[in-house]
Regions:
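Hydrophobic alpha-helical segments within soluble ligand-binding/sensing domains
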Residues: 85, 93-120, 153-158, 178, ...
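Recognition helix of helix-turn-helix DNA-binding domains
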Residues: 318-353
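Regulatory hinge/linker segments at domain boundaries
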Residues: 285-306
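Short alpha-helical "packing" element that flanks the helix-turn-helix/winged-helix DNA-binding module
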Residues: 308-315, 354
Length: 365
């Protein structure tokens, strides 16, 4: 791998996360002696410069679908950066997955293939999403059949390998873990799926459109860049991989009268545009009693993403929902959701009240 081909739409460069994505890749390329090629539309991609894969960055699902359609004839492997999607979910209280249905579907697949001795592999300790998966799995099987990553994934696999003979199937916590698990099995002489039937629980949008895929996570934009570059090396060595999803973990803040705490969760793209929060498993925020204190207000707005701040700026400037939607590249319903959320959080009911509140405390968005 001697190049890093990055496809990022021009309009995303107007946002801080878009600029920082390009900056981090530029720094990484310079540090490791790689050539960074930045494209803004799939139609202008140079196959020679891509060397078989392309990194795609964007939040607009319609644009992403367009990219997949355009790149499919080129047989390029897609590395999809979904880190920026977290900006839509920085200040909600929780995200709930339907992990029970996911596990049930996995078990139905195994049942159809007469696989009944199943292990759950690769769950990260202290990861909210993986903990939910573990609990649902334990309801169906035994805790002894769950192999979690406490120190390293190598130690986790070694623990599993000592008891591997008693299993005919494995459900992995995510697709990235599944690829690692598959490689280790091949190295140890096991055949997939003849000896072990393997299921990887992928989470992201592209996973349902292009298969097989890898999903992996990073903790900030710098580590996301490093993970992406490492994964790109894997794609060039394994042509059976069609796509890879690289995304960041979110810091989720719950504000309540009893205090505040942070947690980490993982997100499914189907929650990107919530029309009804209750239907999407999103819990509403409790309103702090000291909400109108200037320090609390400053903290609220400082924790907002660049997209959210742009929504509020345009709202204060009197722009219509459609104009705001066009400016920040999300649906009108998504804009309305963000507006209603900030109204509820600030205990106000109109655009005029928001303007009055900001003027009173001299807060500039």
């Amino acid at each position: 791998m001697s190049s890093l081909p990055l496809l990022i739409h021009t309009k995303y460069l107007a946002f801080e996360w878009g600029k920082s994505t390009v900056d981090y890749f530029r720094k990484y390329a310079a540090k490791h002696g790689l050539d960074l090629f930045v494209f803004h539309e799939p139609e202008v991609i140079d196959i020679v410069q891509c060397q078989g894969y392309v990194i795609v960055s964007g939040v607009d699902l319609l644009w992403l679908k367009h990219v997949v359609t355009e790149l499919e004839p080129l047989k390029l492997q897609i590395v999809l950066l979904n880190g920026e999607l977290w900006n839509y979910r920085e200040n909600i209280s929780h995200i709930i997955f339907d992990q029970k249905s996911l596990l049930r579907n996995s078990l139905e697949v195994l049942h159809r293939h007469n696989r009944t001795n199943t292990a759950f592999f690769g769950a990260l300790k202290h990861d909210t999403s993986d903990a939910v998966k573990e609990n649902y799995f334990a309801d169906c099987f035994q805790w002894d059949d769950i192999y979690s990553i406490t120190d390293s994934i190598e130690d986790c696999f070694a623990q599993f390998w000592r008891k591997a003979a008693q299993y005919d199937s494995v459900i992995c916590a995510n697709d990235g873990i599944a690829v690692y698990f598959m490689q280790r099995c091949f190295a140890n002489g096991l055949s997939i799926p003849e000896d072990l039937y393997l299921i990887g629980n992928g989470n992201l949008w592209l996973s349902s459109h292009v298969t097989p895929t890898i999903s992996t996570a990073a903790y900030d934009r710098k580590s996301m860049t490093e993970v992406t570059a490492q994964i790109c090396g894997l794609t060039t060595a394994n042509t059976s991989i069609s796509s890879i999803d690289v995304f960041m973990k979110a810091t989720v803040i719950e504000r309540a009268s009893t205090g505040a705490f942070t947690d980490s969760v993982m997100m499914n793209n189907e929650y990107l545009y919530p029309y009804n929060p209750a239907e999407h498993g999103i819990l509403s925020l409790d309103i702090p009693p000291e909400i109108h204190h200037i320090q609390t207000l400053s903290q609220i707005f400082s924790s907002c993403s660049s997209q959210q701040l742009e929504i509020y700026r345009q709202l204060v400037n009197g722009e219509s929902y459609q104009t705001i939607s066009d400016a920040v590249y999300i649906t009108v319903d998504a804009v309305k959701y963000h507006v209603k959320k900030i109204y509820k959080l600030l205990d106000i009911h109109s655009r005029k009240e928001l303007c009055t509140l900001l003027d009173h405390y001299r807060i500039v968005l």
